[in-house]
Amino acid sequence: MNMKKATIAATAGIAVTAFAAPTIASASTVVVEAGDTLWGIAQDKGTTVDALKKANNLTSDKIVPGQKLQITEVASEKTEKSVTATWLNVRSGAGVDNSIVTSLKGGTKVTVESTEANGWYKISYGEGKTGYVNGKYLGTTVTSAPAPEVKEETTTQAQAAPAAETKPEVKQSTPATVLPKAETKTETPAVDTTASTYTVKSGDTIWALSSKYGTSVQNIMSWNNLSSSSIYVGQVLAVKQEAAKTASPKAEVKTEAPTAEKQVSAPVVKENTQTTTAKKEVTPQKQTNTQAPAQAAKPAPAPAPTVNTNASSYTVKSGDTLSKIATTFGTTVSKIKALNGLNSDNLQVGQVLKVKGTVPTANTNSNSNATAPTTNTNNNTSNTSTSTPSKNTNTNSNASQGSSSTASASSLIAEAQKHLGKAYSWGGNGPTTFDCSGFTKYVFAKSGVTLPRTSGAQYASSTKISESQAKPGDLVFFDYGNGIAHVGIYVGNGQMINAQDNGVKYDNIHGSGWGQFLVGFGRV
């Protein structure tokens, strides 16, 4: 009898073991079911897509029903970062196709919860709110341990003791509620809006500085002799007019030396004597930047020869005028305006101008030729063969098409330049704020060309061309990993005008944050 019981007990034990085994296996693996995604499984199991792919040697996000996936734990350590852009959009998902939840100001600290496959971060901010941001706009990584330390200080001093090495002063300043304020204010007091100069910090832009100091982008570029809106960390900028002026008397006093007089005889000074008082503010800085190196080393006169008078194009710099450029290249103001389709003498720093070429001449000749064949045709109706006038007619129509195409590109870029410095907003259609495709659609519409609303649709509807074929007025497209997500207007020389997070501005299509995402060009 006892033997029978032992046999039954052993059999029961085997049965229990047989049913228990799958339960243990399911603790570290999961079987994919219809409708499952890596992202959904990661959320359900408290891990990340990257961790799942690494654990299972997956090269893509594709999974199939019945597939077994190994589940691994994710390191619990999180990182704290700060926003480096002026404003950073927080979205409901990892990519620009998701809706904007809110926008965080530059310098705001966030906690990185996880990293997505496309370079986006899931973050937490404020009072436990979460969202997704583009990782390239976050910087200054620190371990996120300080957050719990602040709360522990309010409960027990014994627990807060380890923080004494890094924050002894904070502990002595009693209430823990002071800590967030102290951290927030450490960045703002650094900006003294009454100061006349400012040292550039990470995340700064000329547009943001102009807002802080109550001036314009153009003024800051002018006072600092900047040829583009690019600035670098540590650069000292004049943000008040007096800062630009204080440097000029020193340079003028020392230009009385015979060496300086040779430089003064250049066309630049002739231009300055003829310009209005408003432009005189720009000219002294140009002298300041040119002369200052001369005191340190004699090779300073190098800036003058940098203008290649044999070049066919010229990039506008601070203090330039059409008259000055025409004198430098031995041409006339009217010819430069005709070459570039300009209706006024207004120029923008960074604008690329044609200074040589045959477009105006070709237009003049084509018009005079158009008259000549007409006269000949009328006078020689019976004696001249009809083939000659028809040839002339075709030649003239082709010439007019070429000139109208050039004028169209020039007017399109001129329209784009009108909006430099305007703010970015997702879904912005203009004219006060834009997003990238809203900007291109608006500018092209002003030239009579209708574009689709999104960057992806604009890419699909354009004729694809290589970079060597690209001309000013063509579209340039970028892909951040989930398809076409950004578009700008190409202006030549590797530059584009586009609406991005920092507003409407010039950018180098091969520069940092752009070159690696460049897809190509399109013509409409």
Swiss-Prot record:
Domain LysM as annotated: residue spans: 28-71, 196-239, 312-355
Top-rank EC class of the record's enzyme: hydrolase
Residue span(s) of domain SH3b: 78-142
Residue spans crossing the bilayer: none
Region forming the signal peptide: 1-27
Gene Ontology biological process terms, A to Z: proteolysis
Organism: Listeria ivanovii
Protein family: Belongs to the peptidase C40 family.
Pfam families on file: LysM, NLPC_P60, SH3_3
InterPro entries documented for this protein: LysM_dom (IPR018392), LysM_dom_sf (IPR036779), NLP_P60_dom (IPR000064), Papain-like_cys_pep_sf (IPR038765), Peptidase_C40 (IPR051202), SH3-like_bac-type (IPR003646)
Function of the molecule: This major extracellular protein may be involved in the invasion of non-professional phagocytic cells by Listeria.
Protein name per UniProt: Probable endopeptidase p60
UniProt entry keywords in alphabetical sequence: Hydrolase, Protease, Repeat, Signal, Thiol protease
Chain segments carrying region Disordered: 145-190, 247-314, 360-410
Comp. bias regions, Low complexity: 155-165, 284-311
UniProt domain comment: LysM domains are thought to be involved in peptidoglycan binding.
Catalytic residues as annotated in Swiss-Prot or TrEMBL: C436, H486, N498
EC numbers, comma separated: 3.4.-.-
Residues annotated as domain NlpC/P60: 406-524
Upper lineage: Bacteria, Bacillati, Bacillota, Bacilli, Bacillales
Listed GO MF terms: cysteine-type peptidase activity
